[in-house]
C-alpha cells in the first residue's frame, strides 16, 4: 500500500502543472490609474480613477469611477491593446459634463506609468460626437 501511495505522490509531483501564460500587452495596462479629462486647454479637468486587471482569458477588464461624484462604476471595454496604444470604449453612462447618456471612445499612448490621449463622446443612442477632449493618467498601483 505504501508503494502505491508513494508512486501516486511522485507521479502527481512530476505531472506538468498549468503553464503560465506569457504576459501579453494587456498586462502593461493593469493596475489603478488616476487622471483627469479636459474639454479645453483652460479646463481644470474632471478627475477619475480606472481600475484594470487581466482576466484569465488574457483580456483587459476595467472600470471607471468619477472620484468626485456618487456614481456606480462604469464598464470599460478594451477595443485595441498593443504595447504602446490602448483604445477603450466606456459606457454607456450618464455624463455629468454633457448631461446625457453617452458612450466614450478613448485612444491613449502608454509611456512608462503614464497613459495620455484623446476622447470622443457620443450619445448612447448613436449619432455625432457631442464632446471631444484629452486625458492624462498616471498609474498609482500596479
Give the role of each language-model region.
Residues 25-110, 118-119, 124-142:
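Central antiparallel beta-sheet cores of small beta-barrel/beta-sandwich binding domains
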Residues 7-8, 85:
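N-terminal regions of proteins, emphasizing targeting and processing segments when present
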Residues 15-18:
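Bacterial signal peptide processing site
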Amino acid at each position: 500500500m505504501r508503494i502505491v501511495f508513494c508512486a501516486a505522490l511522485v507521479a502527481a509531483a512530476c505531472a506538468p502543472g498549468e503553464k503560465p501564460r506569457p504576459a501579453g500587452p494587456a498586462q502593461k495596462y493593469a493596475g489603478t490609474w488616476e487622471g483627469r479629462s479636459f474639454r479645453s486647454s483652460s479646463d481644470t479637468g474632471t478627475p477619475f480613477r480606472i481600475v484594470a486587471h487581466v482576466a484569465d482569458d488574457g483580456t483587459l477588464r476595467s472600470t471607471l469611477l468619477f472620484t468626485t461624484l456618487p456614481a456606480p462604476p462604469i464598464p470599460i471595454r478594451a477595443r485595441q491593446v498593443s504595447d504602446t496604444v490602448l483604445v477603450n470604449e466606456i459606457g454607456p453612462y450618464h455624463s455629468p459634463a454633457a448631461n446625457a447618456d453617452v458612450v466614450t471612445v478613448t485612444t491613449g499612448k502608454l509611456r512608462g506609468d503614464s497613459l495620455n490621449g484623446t476622447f470622443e463622446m457620443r450619445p448612447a443612442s448613436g449619432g455625432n460626437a457631442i464632446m471631444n477632449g484629452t486625458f492624462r493618467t498616471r498609474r498609482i498601483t500596479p
